[in-house]
Structures are given as C-alpha cells and as structure tokens.
Amino acid sequence: MLSSTFVRSKAGLVPVILAALILAACTGDAPQTPPPVNIQDEASANSDYYLQQLQQSSDDNKADWQLLAIRALLREAKVPQAAEQLSTLPANLSDTQRQEQQLLAAELLIAQKNTPAAADILAKLEATQLSANQKVRYYQAQIAANQDKATLPLIRAFIAQEPLLTDKAHQDNIDGTWQSLSQLTPQELNTMVINADENVLQGWLDLLRVYQDNKQDPKLLKAGIKDWQTRYPQNPAAKNLPTALTQISNFSQASTAKIALLLPLSGPAQVFADAIQQGFTAAQNGSAVTASVPVTPNVTESSPTDTAAVVSDDTPATLPAPVPPPVVTNAQVKIYDTNTQPLAALLAQAQQDGATLVVGPLLKPEVEQLSATPSTLNILALNQPEASNNSPNICYFALSPEDEARDAAHHLWEQQKRMPLLLVPRGALGERIAKAFADEWQKQGGQTVLQQNFGSTTELKQSINSGAGIRLTGTPVSVSNVAAAPASVTIAGLTIPAPPIDAPVVSTSSSGNIDAVYIIATPSELTLIKPMIDMATSSRSKPALFASSRSYQAGAGPDYRLEMEGIQFSDIPLMAGSNPALLQQASAKYANDYSLVRLYAMGIDAWALANHFSEMRQIPGFQVKGVTGDLTASSDCVITRKLPWLQYRQGMVVPLA
C-alpha cells in the first residue's frame, strides 16, 4: 500500500502538469517568434525576410534586423536601398551595433567606389573586438579599399584574414597574397620596415626574394622553394603554395629540336617576313652581334644616317641591361610560306614533318584562326588577336603600335600623369592605338582618356597656315566593357556588382586638366603638330609631350631634334643604343629603313622566345632581355615589352633617367 504522503504529492503534481500542457498548446497556436538576432554572425537570408522582420519586431530588435537587412541588400547589389536603410538607423545604438554599422558603412562606400572614405572608417575599427565572421568582412573590405595595390596594409590584411578561411577561399587568399607581393618593386621591397613579431610576413618576403633571385632558372627556383618550405614550415604558403609557384614545381622543358617557321614569304607582306626570317636565322646561327656595350658617343651633329641614339657627353647612358648571349642550339628550322596553304594544313604538315614548336604565323587573320585550329604543337604566334584565349600551348609576340601604346600608358602613369590626351591619325590605326592605350590606362586605375584625331599632312599644313592651333580637347575613348566598367567588389565571398558609372567629364579648353599628350605621328606630322600645340597653350599650362617610335626614323637631323625639344619617345632597346654594333649591322643591311630594322630585331627575339617557350608559358615573371624590349608574359602568355624612353634635349637624344 502506498503511503498517503506519496499519494498527496503525486496528486499535487497533476494540476502543474496540466497547466504546462495547456500553456504549451496555447503557445503552439500563437505566431512563432523569430530566433534571437545575432548581427555578428552570418546573414544568409534575403533582404525581404530581414525587412519583414524589421516591420514586425519590437523596438529592442529593430536595429538588429535593420543591420542584417543592409548587409543582405549589399549582397544583392541593391546599393541605393542599402544606403537609404543605413541613413535611417537610430542614433542610440549599442557598442556592438555601432561596430556593425561602421563595417557596413565601409562596405557600402566600397560598393560606391569611394575607397578613401572606406579606408578612413576601417582605420577606426578595432579588429580584436569583431567576431570571426566580421573579421573576414573587415579584412576583405581592407583589401578592396586598397584597390589591390601592393601596399603593406594590403598584404597585412591578406595575412590576418588567412586563418579565418577554408577550402577555395583559403587558396584564393594565398594567391592574392602572392599576387600583391609580386607587384612590389625592388626599391619597395628593400625599404619595407616590418615588426619583429611579423614572422608570417617575414616568411612571405623571403619567399619573394627566393623567387626573384632564381626565376630565370627553373631548377634553382624549384630547389629554392623547397629549401624555403623547410625553413618556414608554419607559414601558410609552405603548406599550400601559391598556384603560380605550384606550376613551377611541375615545370617541364619542351623540345625545340625541330622548329617550323610560318611566314608570308610571298605576296605584299613578303618584305616584312623576310626581315623577320633573317633576324631569326642570324640569331640561330649566332651571327647576330648580341653582346651589349654601353654607348656614349661623342657626337654633336648627326648625319642623316646616324644609327645609334645620340647622347650628350655629360649624360650617363642609362640603357637596358645587357641581353643574354645568343641561344645557339642544334635545332633544325624549316620555313613554310603561309600564302601557299590554309593554316590548318600547314600546322598538320609541320607536325607530320616532326616539328615540336611553331613560330608564326605573322598576319593577324591567321593568328585569329589559331584558337579554332586544334593543334598539340607549341606555338609562338608573331601577332596578337583582338581577344586572346588562354591556350596552354600558345604564346603571342607582337611588335605592334598597340603594344607600344600599352607600354606608353604605363610610362605616363609612372610619370605621375593623370589626364592624358591622345593625338592619333584618323582611321582604323588610330582607333586601335587609342583603345589599347585606354584599356591599359584604366587597368592601372586611370579614368577617362581623351582622343583627338588629325588628318593628312596637307590638312595639318592648312591649319597651321591659318593660325589654328591644336586645343587640348577630345572625346572619350570607347574601350571594352571589361575595362570601361568599374570592377565588381567581392566582400567575404559575396560579389557586389559595380554601380553605373557617370558620363565622363571632357576638358573643353586649353586651361583644362590635360597634363600629357601622347602623339602617334610620323616625323613630318610631328614637325607640324608640336608648334600647333604650342600656339594653343601658354607656357604655364603646357602639358608634357610624348611620342611613339613612329616619330623616330632615319634622316632626322639636328634641326629636327632641336624642334622636338622636350618630347619623350619610346623605341626598342636596339634603336635606343643598347647594342651599337648590331644596330650598325642591321641599318646597313636595310639601308637605314628603321621599320625593317625593328622587324629584324623581332626575328632575333623570336628565336630567344622560342628557346624559352616553356619558361614564358609556365613561370610567371620570367623575363627575356631582348633587343625589342624587356619581354615578359601575361597570364595568357601575351608577350609584353617594356621599352626604354628617350628625350630630345638641346639638339640631342638622351636616355631618360
């Protein structure tokens, strides 16, 4: 028999249990309350959900839901709506809410392309007080605010973010760190001051030095990376190498035993093809004089047949580094005329003949066909298509005005010029050059580039006779969509598309902001253009003048050099005086036709590139110091040329220091 005490206790529990069940049933019928809000965590729902919760929540939770809604709106590229919500946040926020508000404000400014203001806000945030999720966003915002420029704060942001990431995001961070480090100049690297406890950063900098010291020798580089991994076992890159360096570990040298040279040896382009072939053959035989010698000739007056750049007696010749000794191998070269068969048939014939590498074709229509012509052969094309495809077996080497214009964009940017005007000949050539310059200009962070076209020499003479100068006005250059539009921004793995850009502002008078003019003209055209610019500008507002190699040709005597006073121009190292013996040899061969001399030089460098095809294709930053420029390859193996720049000064041509 149960005790009366137990019965009474059990009976007393019944009302309590019943009450609990009744309350539970009532709760089930009531509207569900959203879970507690954590603004420091992920915001994975869409903006409509958060805005709905904002409307339905109590005053205590409204600010939290609003902050989450702003983050979702940014993720959905609804930038104006995000800005509106941010501006209506209440003033009485908690410290946690205030931190999230500031982080969102920085992300909004980045989406609006106002990176300086975003950087100011980020500088006031204390990262140690942020959650792990917020830290990822904070460092991503710092990276975006630096506009991917190689700076110490940018590299530190990558390093700080690395432990917070996993999988693909982690590898992307490693690759981003390496890409930023790779953009540092030797001077920046040598003057960089870091803290004693920045062991990870020190390891990265040592890896960069290993790479820079050994990148010209794949075997040494591979050994250097392995040694670095032993010395820095805890560095994140020791466990997961940057993708670019992983490629080096898998480096394999391609065979160049048999080379097929594809050129138009008949037809209207034959004269150009002959010059390239002769340069290629001379380099193959070692008969091209390639030992570089500093040149400081004592010349005060030059004859029309001068073949070397003229430098003053008291000006040191700052010329390109010596080119490497000629690559002399036992390679067999067979030449094919591209005007005799279709490209696909020639490639098949070359492969049947045992070729392991193809150099050519030269003409752009045939180069455009390469991507649609399947071939397992390695191919060094001697021109560049309008849109290059990243084919693992193709590199593109062009000696074109567009290539020179891209180098000019870099040079003007390095000269601190920010508002360039392009003076180009009317027609397709001028349009291509202007587009190439503007594309490269905007990749560096430049804004709108203005373009003005000029007509024939007769038209220029008529203008100058009527007293008309050239005003510093122009129309915006139309560039490709990728280059013209601001880049989208990725924050914490979320891509925010760029907002629409405003219409460009065009300078309409000579008192505008134009600070540089890049001129594509022949010597006779430049003789007329320069005084016309002088007529329309005052000495105080005169911009710096730059020209292409098109303006530097044989026959330019002392009078011409005096008239061109102050103009800077670019040309290949051979023409700039890096190798006077070779220049004299080539100039005599082609009767001072500098156009053919440059193509002869292209043939010499094509031989060097063919023998370093694997390095150019597989090792980022690998460089060949050629007679047409310092040659490196982009990620899709488009060979870029860094050219020397010279200046007309007191009747002489001097290297630009």
Swiss-Prot record:
GO terms for cellular component: periplasmic side of cell outer membrane. Belongs to the LpoA family. Its main location: membrane. Keywords: Cell outer membrane, Cell shape, Lipoprotein, Membrane, Palmitate, Peptidoglycan synthesis, Signal. Transmembrane segments: none annotated. Regulator of peptidoglycan synthesis that is essential for the function of penicillin-binding protein 1A (PBP1a). It is a lipid-anchor. This is Penicillin-binding protein activator LpoA. A lipid is attached at C26 (N-palmitoyl cysteine). A lipid is attached at C26 (S-diacylglycerol cysteine). Residues 1-25 form the signal peptide. Interacts with PBP1a. CDD domains: PBP1_YraM_LppC_lipoprotein-like (cd06339). It is found in: Cell outer membrane. One of its GO terms (biological process) is regulation of cell shape. One of its GO terms (molecular function) is enzyme regulator activity.
